[in-house]
Amino acid sequence: MPRIAYLGPQGTFTESALLQMISGAMVPGGDADDTAVTPVPTDSTPAGLEAVRSGAADYACVPIENSIEGSVLPTLDSLAVGAPLQIFAELTLAVSFSIVVRPDHDGDVATVAAFPVAAAQVRRWLAEHLPAAQLVPAHSNAAAAADVAGGRADAGISTALAAERYGLRSLAAGVVDEPNARTRFVLVGRPAPPPARTGADRTSVALRLPNTPGALVAAMTELSIRDIDLTRIESRPTRTELGTYVFFLDCVGHLEDDAVAEALKALHRRCEDVRYLGSWPTGTAAGAPPPSSDEATRWLTRLREGLPTPPEGGR
């Protein structure tokens, strides 16, 4: 029975994403029955990943990217250091919030408990509807609901699931400044063979480059010359000295795609370190898949065997 860490307490968007991963049979070694999985709530995203490293959990469901705020930096930073971890699945969740209060609350709202990422996504709504309220930081969206239930805040920015579990009522539901807000969650475990190639896959790596002119351009060239679609590049400081960075790259394709495999081998030669973060299915095409090398391989084989080749390299 897989143990899966997630940002708790119960009622967070991360728990909602985890439940959808379970029902979609996306957890290795599990099935679509949520009783076949043991959820392990943690206080933070890094704590969930450390639970996997220590063996206290088999996987962690963590947010990695938000359409409003961009990459979830604690997740990236935790993946870049420590024992290697690997991504096995992803799920994108539509995000909207509930402004929750205790059932007997009928006065003004002076304090609002909020997870900072959530507060950023409802900033305009708060300015319009609760301009005088003071924000009180919470560990998570569900923790904001717990703060309201415990009387530590008048209202909270939380989820419908948390409101139900803590017996709260909603002042407003479906609250979000941007109606198409989405958060992408990933399922992370210890290194293992990646899920099978589907043709709609994503591969991610973290690179440490030598401090030489053109090092980043040279690394990117290994992808471009193979027609690999790069969908994300982001840098984070190594925290060891000024001017040194880890570069996170996402591309369309799978480790089993010849073009991706060749690019990774080339990056391994060029970079000080290449941390493979996984190849996994995205469910839908996220860009142009890498070209097949089958035709070129057949052409090269004929050359090596001294056989005639069709005009124009076999095309």
From Swiss-Prot:
Checking InterPro entries in the record gives:
ACT-like_dom_sf, ACT_dom, Chor_mutase/pphenate_deHydtase, Preph_deHydtase, Preph_deHydtase_CS
- Print the keywords alphabetically: Amino-acid biosynthesis, Aromatic amino acid biosynthesis, Lyase, Phenylalanine biosynthesis
Entry's Pfam families?
ACT, PDT
Question: What do we know about how this protein assembles, alone or with others?
Answer: Homodimer.
List the PANTHER family: PREPHENATE DEHYDRATASE P PROTEIN (PTHR21022), PREPHENATE DEHYDRATASE-RELATED (PTHR21022:SF19)
Q: Which reaction does it catalyse?
A: prephenate + H(+) = 3-phenylpyruvate + CO2 + H2O
Which pathway is recorded for this entry? Amino-acid biosynthesis; L-phenylalanine biosynthesis; phenylpyruvate from prephenate: step 1/1
The EC number of this protein is 4.2.1.51
- Cellular-component GO terms for this entry: cytoplasm
The site feature described as Essential for activity is recorded at 183
Q: What residues does the ACT domain cover?
A: 204-281
Which terms under GO biological process does the entry name? Answer: L-phenylalanine biosynthetic process
Q: Which GO terms describe its molecular function?
A: prephenate dehydratase activity; protein homodimerization activity
Which organism does this record belong to?
A: Mycobacterium sp. (strain JLS)
Q: What is this protein called?
A: Prephenate dehydratase
Location of the Prephenate dehydratase domain:
3-190
